[in-house]
């Protein structure tokens, strides 16, 4: 009865199932299953094989007993649905799931060979024989290996035939290097089927020790120059940087540092030659300077005794008119050098200083240069001399470094202290610790009226409002 139902439903008439309507669209990307000429009994056996496997999916669980008519009807309906979906007995050219030809007998069902995964674990294999005993063998118990695992290799081979390898490289091939530590030498050179993890031409071509690059089109690189660099994580970089070991410091210029004109790119970086410092011992860097950087022998420059005498005379060189005159006179100008006077060269100035640093600071007044900047918040004042900057910083900090030895008054500037001390030693001075006021005699006015010497010793500076004493409780803003 089940075979008759399968033959009736598997007729070439159009099926009402939705899956059969779209079965032709499923079969476009697959090789069509070319069905051999078989009798209606083979078709019935094929459908019976599918029907016997349906209880494994729970379609009709009562079909194992074979006694209930309702179970038989349900199994027949399910077999009809599956046979209609898989084109069991239908049009032989549009099987959507026939991936590979089974290579078995012509009467055997393709579902029994390739898709016997539909078998129930308890059934003995109604689709294995293929002929007509699919429904009767449903009650037999036999040990059966999982068929899905056994069919993996056949399915993969069929998929390789259906989907040939595309010409474009896999997106992971660009970063997957042949020098990966996880790869063995045998795996890279194996002649198996090409897979996505095969090493292709990436951003670094594997090079052999003699510098020959591997072919970019080959998927399996040659094992000759590759196996030597497999066990090193930086094997692909060996030939690129093999010439950098001693070429930059060798006798000849290396090829990678030569410009197209043939000039070495490091010719501008000359070493310090020993001729500039005749009193010092020749350094090994200067001795090897020609061969290391310049490409030729280092020629020592002869320095004039005049410049060496100026450089190592024990003092800094000076270009003031007095020093230039002493150099012009030679030995006769020893008296000028002994005086050590440095005059300003600006016409009409005529100031003379005993130190060259003082002369340089004086020349900044003429040029207007003020290199010393106050870094106090929102100040930014610039000064010509560093001592002026230090004096200015005390106005921000409120520091009074200089104290009077008589009255213990403190001052920010040393010249203010010296003026204050003169008031104690003067004829009209108070002379006592509390006599801070000026005397009526000559020299009674002391120093500057605007500086801090008139203030008490512990008074806060004007720039520190947080140090001001709190107002008295009985006064408010100076008013009673």
Swiss-Prot record:
Compositionally skewed regions (Low complexity) per UniProt: 16-25, 298-307
GO biological process: embryonic limb morphogenesis; regulation of transcription by RNA polymerase II
Major location (coarse): nucleus
Biased composition annotated in UniProt, kind: Gly residues: 287-297, 426-445
Record SUPFAM superfamilies: beta-beta-alpha zinc fingers
Zinc finger (C2H2-type): 342-366, 372-396, 402-424
Region (Disordered): 1-44, 280-308, 416-480
Matching SMART domains: ZnF_C2H2
Function: Transcription factor which plays a key role in limb development. Positively regulates FGF8 expression in the apical ectodermal ridge (AER) and contributes to limb outgrowth in embryos.
Family the entry assigns: Belongs to the Sp1 C2H2-type zinc-finger protein family.
Domain remark from Swiss-Prot or TrEMBL: The 9aaTAD motif is a transactivation domain present in a large number of yeast and animal transcription factors.
Protein name: Transcription factor Sp8
Gene source species: Gallus gallus (Chicken)
Gene encoding the protein: SP8
């Amino acid at each position: 009865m089940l075979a008759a139902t399968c033959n009736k439903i598997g007729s070439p008439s159009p099926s009402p199932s939705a899956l059969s309507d779209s079965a032709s669209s499923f079969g476009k990307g697959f090789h069509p299953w070319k069905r051999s000429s078989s009798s209606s009994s083979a078709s019935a056996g094929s459908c019976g094989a599918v029907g016997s496997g349906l209880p494994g999916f729970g379609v009709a669980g009562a079909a194992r007993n074979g006694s209930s008519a309702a179970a038989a009807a349900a199994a027949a309906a399910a077999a009809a649905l599956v046979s209609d979906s898989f084109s069991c007995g239908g049009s032989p050219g549009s099987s959507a799931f026939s991936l590979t030809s089974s290579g078995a007998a012509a009467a055997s069902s393709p579902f029994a060979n390739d898709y016997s995964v539909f078998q129930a674990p308890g059934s003995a294999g109604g689709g294995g024989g293929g002929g007509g005993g699919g429904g009767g063998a449903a009650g037999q118990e036999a040990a059966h290996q999982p068929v899905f695992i056994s069919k993996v290799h056949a399915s993969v081979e069929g998929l390789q035939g259906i989907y040939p390898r595309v010409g474009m490289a896999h997106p992971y091939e660009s970063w997957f290097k042949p020098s990966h530590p996880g790869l063995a030498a045998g795996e890279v050179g194996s002649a198996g089927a090409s897979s996505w993890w095969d090493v292709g031409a990436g951003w670094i071509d594997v090079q052999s020790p003699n510098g020959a690059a591997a072919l970019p089109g080959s998927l399996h690189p040659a094992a000759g120059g590759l196996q030597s660099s497999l066990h090193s994580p930086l094997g692909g970089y060996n030939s690129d940087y093999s010439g950098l070991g001693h070429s930059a410091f060798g006798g000849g210029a290396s090829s990678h540092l030569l410009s197209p004109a043939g000039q070495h790119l490091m010719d501008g970086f000359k070493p310090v030659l020993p001729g500039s410092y005749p009193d010092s011992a020749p350094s090994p860097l200067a001795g090897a300077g020609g061969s290391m950087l310049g490409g030729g022998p280092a020629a020592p420059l002869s320095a004039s005794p005049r410049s060496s005498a100026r450089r190592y005379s024990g003092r800094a060189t000076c270009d003031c008119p007095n020093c230039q005159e002493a150099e012009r006179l030679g030995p006769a100008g020893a008296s000028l050098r002994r005086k050590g006077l440095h005059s300003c060269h600006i016409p009409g100035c005529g100031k003379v200083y005993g130190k060259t640093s003082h002369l340089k600071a004086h020349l900044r007044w003429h040029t207007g240069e003020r290199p010393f900047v106050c870094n106090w918040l929102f100040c930014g004042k610039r000064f010509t001399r560093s001592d002026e900057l230090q004096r200015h910083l005390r106005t921000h900090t409120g520091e009074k470094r200089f104290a009077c030895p008589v009255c213990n008054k403190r001052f920010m500037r040393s010249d203010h202290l010296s003026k204050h001390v003169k008031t104690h030693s003067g004829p009209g001075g108070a002379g006592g610790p509390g006599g801070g006021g000026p005397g009526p005699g000559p020299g009674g006015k002391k120093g500057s009226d605007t500086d801090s010497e008139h203030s008490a010793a512990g008074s806060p500076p004007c720039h520190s409002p947080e140090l001001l004493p709190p107002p008295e409780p009985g006064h408010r803003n100076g008013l009673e």
